[in-house]
Amino acid sequence: MLKILNNSLDGIVLGQQKADFDDVILNNPNYSLEFDRKHKIQSDSELITVSSSRNCDEFSLNGKVINFSNLEKFLEEEDPLIEVSDEENYFYIFPKYNLVLYVNYKDNLFLQILIYDESIRDLYDNKGKKYSDFQKSKLRNPTLNHDKLIFIPYK
């Protein structure tokens, strides 16, 4: 199970310099690491995002297990920002945790779990609409059900 604790994912801490990581972590196919580009010496670059490259059905966030049986409640409590992808998967952005979840509801999988550094917060936090607003708009506009064909008779 993936573990997110403060600003780390499975013990990989944001803000660490590239030189602090060994080749095992840098080349691990389960994680994608992104370093800043503001340093001339590449080994001085700091980690700004880390994401899981594997699909999972649950993860731990500061000791709380999040899975598909409690995801809806978690979303209602946290009211994240939301975006819908072309494939009808959902991106949830949690500014409070510097966390992005890419969710596939058809297969009940978290396709990507990403944490980001404070230095790039504005790249993530200004996108999408609030989860609560998105839910209200779904109730007002029932034609958002993309799985169903709805016929509206001409009057």
Task: Name the predicted role of every residue range.
Residues 1-155:
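Short helix/turn-capping signatures at newly exposed starts of structured segments
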